[in-house]
């Protein structure tokens, strides 16, 4: 945790009363009301620990937003020291669109920008599965074999997303190890965001998807 305290203030549309949720992560939480006039919506304030002040660096914040939340539907704006806002994420996820609406050029650009490739993929596989478990996968087979393809310790290169939020790029078991030359993403709405990486790794949902 980077914050020693979190304060969430929320005001419902059509009302003037705000509710405040506070927690230090150690002694539960406290909810109180506030009659102070506030704008409709929710604000979240993090009171950073002294050893986490580097998270106030704008470049670091933008990098973190780009890594973990680049593809969520809501734009994330970061204000600089001059109070000027700049959108830090693309707020788009190519894989959520129907494959019929995506051009080969768009697939190639995504492949290059996401996986650092220099040429177009040899083959792409784009599927959406709906049912008791919902997930989308966008997989690429590169034209050029990775230089470390035959290294036993090479990890698979399929990144896991939950509701468009990046979780990890080295979750074991998503695809067999002999397919470690395959690169791509797996996005599911059937896993919870508030679980640890270890629980995701051992999730029966992930095993069924695999």
Predicted regions and their residues:
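GHKL/Bergerat-fold ATPase module
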Residues: 73, 86-98, 134-210
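Short alpha-helical segments and helix-capping/turn motifs at coil-helix boundaries
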Residues: 28-29, 60-62, 119-126, 168
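GHKL-type ATPase core
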Residues: 1-87, 162
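Extended, Lys/Arg-enriched charged tracts that mediate electrostatic binding to polyanionic substrates
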Residues: 104-146
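Membrane-protein biogenesis/insertion across secretory and organellar systems
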Residues: 64, 77-92, 97-98, 103-104, ...
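Helical mechanochemical/support elements of P-loop NTPase systems and associated helical scaffolds
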Residues: 2, 40, 57-61, 103, ...
